[in-house]
Amino acid sequence: MYIGAHVRASGGVWKAIDNGVELGCEAIQFFAGSPRTWKPQLYSEKDAARFREARAASPIRFVLIHTIYLINLASTNEDFYEKSVTALVGAVVAAEQLGADAIVTHIGSHQGAGFEPGLRRVQTALGRALDEAGDSPVRVLLENTAGAGGTMGVDFAELAAMIDAVDGDPRVGLCLDTAHLFESGVELRTPEGLEAAIAGLDATCGLDRLVCLHLNDSKTALGSNRDRHENIGDGDLGLRAFAQIVNHPAFAGLPGILEVPGDAGDGPDRSNVERLLALRAGAT
């Protein structure tokens, strides 16, 4: 597994590469623009070229763009839904400009309408984003959820239904968040639990759909349905869980991205990256 983190890209998108290298990352994720506004982020060819050049000269192996927080691809509010689809399409366009490998998106909540109506809206949203992508190799990764408030993608069966809804388009993949898995009731702390989770994923979605992991410890208990990230080893998952995860052959060659609060509360930091690198190297 390649260890990385969510990094800042302010002051010039190419600085995301510099910030990742400074943290000791082998992979990075960042927001294309402000995560709390609808304003689309498009890059000049000069800035995009500078980003691609910086990446080529760095040890960064994977680049992911995370969509904005506002997105709800299952929203029952038509205006909000249209803005969400537009934002998803914008992220695909930005990723293609920069040569990013994939975008990661939260799916959203059906807001009480039920899973099936929500699924139909997600299907339409993904279809429009994929149409916009055309022949681009950029993949759209659906992130699982902890399970609160009617959120979509709480288990592998729901994620599989979304993949099936777009006829198994190979450009649709998964980003699994370890904290969300645990908080939704998936045991990852024991070898048996981790193996069962991997088998469940393979039986429903297929392991080939897994493109990225978000490596976050959890402040809340197994099955809490409460999304609260914690620094690696400081939460209910603990170091042994992450030692298993970063060294498991099923995840070999995949990027593992930290989204933890960081020791100073300012986001992922070098110490959390180094913890995971040490675990991958066999330290306990």
Question: Which sequence ranges carry the predicted segments?
Answer:
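Acidic (Asp/Glu)-rich catalytic clusters
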Residues: 18-25, 44-64, 91-99, 130-137, ...
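Active-site acidic/histidine proton-transfer and metal-coordination neighborhood
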Residues: 57, 73-173
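Alpha-helix N-cap and loop-to-helix initiation/capping positions
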Residues: 39-47, 75-87, 113-125, 150-158, ...
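A general structural detector for well-ordered alpha-helical segments in enzyme core domains, enriched
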Residues: 16-19, 47-54, 87-94, 118-129, ...
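N-terminal pre-domain/capping segments
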Residues: 1-67, 71, 75-93, 282-284
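Histidine-acidic metal/acid-base catalytic patches
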Residues: 2, 156-284
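Conserved, mostly hydrophobic/aromatic
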Residues: 20, 66, 84, 95, ...
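Active-site beta-loop-alpha junctions enriched in small/polar residues
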Residues: 6-10, 33-35, 67-70, 108-110, ...
